[in-house]
Curated annotation (Swiss-Prot):
EC number: 2.1.1.220, 2.1.1.-
Function: Catalytic subunit of tRNA (adenine-N(1)-)-methyltransferase, which catalyzes the formation of N(1)-methyladenine at position 58 (m1A58) in initiator methionyl-tRNA. Catalytic subunit of mRNA N(1)-methyltransferase complex, which mediates methylation of adenosine residues at the N(1) position of a small subset of mRNAs: N(1) methylation takes place in tRNA T-loop-like structures of mRNAs and is only present at low stoichiometries.
Record organism: Mus musculus (Mouse)
Substrate as annotated region, ranges: 20-22, 35-42, 64-65, 85-89, 110-117, 180-183, 205-212
Residue numbers of N-acetylserine PTMs: 2
Signal peptide: none
Main location: nucleus
GO CC annotations, alphabetized: nucleus; tRNA (m1A) methyltransferase complex
Quaternary structure and partners: Heterotetramer; composed of two copies of TRMT6 and two copies of TRMT61A.
Protein name: tRNA (adenine(58)-N(1))-methyltransferase catalytic subunit TRMT61A
Amino acid sequence: MSFVAYEELIKEGDTAILSLGHGSMVAVRVQRGAQTQTRHGVLRHSVDLIGRPFGSKVICSRGGWVYVLHPTPELWTVNLPHRTQILYSTDIALITMMLELRPGSVVCESGTGSGSVSHAIIRSVAPTGHLHTVEFHQQRADKAREEFQEHRLSQWVTVHTQDVCCSGFGVVHVADAVFLDIPSPWEAVGHAWDALKVEGGRFCSFSPCIEQVQRTCQALAAHGFTELSTLEVLPQVYNVRTVSLPLPDLGANNLETNMGSDASPFRSGTPMKETVGHTGYLTFATKTPG
């Protein structure tokens, strides 16, 4: 099993996502002889998981069932153990697009945190790209290395344990893109410039507060970055339904027309009241050659 390449059968050591019902999932490490307790009963790894195809519907001990899903960065994001606050797929999708990530890209990232963005970046740059991710907290860095090893992603990622604001990314002029998710990104802008290739590259920073954005933009302009832009992603859910409106009364002179016409149903989309709130601002910039 790899987050980069799909495999059909579940093997010992794989990470599997158990779908327990609407909106309820859990990630498990498949181990021979192990058991997982769910609200539907016990799931025995040796009998119920190992050797079965991903996507199987598995009956638990109490008669309920779960679906065993192949892991993806998106599923991992909603099931990972939180060591820090994380970014979710809505923001990650825009980051991936605006940084122009593709197979073969080299990316520098800080901080690693819980690895939510890291998994998505690795999936985007594999099989010929690489991620250099920097985490100053030793225990979080060690845990990230362990997870990358378990998910068979180690060949595409190098974890550096250092303060990016003081020591940079550990590489110079190799990156096609840089992503920062740290409290003071403006202090690392100079290191981001040095990490990007001489011929240029893309920059992105995530910040919850507009004051952080202002200081980051000032630092970006001072270091020579161009095409600065800041975006906020706020998804809006729409309720789509079929509506039939009554025909208007056009008076006695139009009685025959009214009697011969039926109300035409049409589909209408109205925004739902519930909407996702503010997560943060995404600031993008470009290092141009020269």
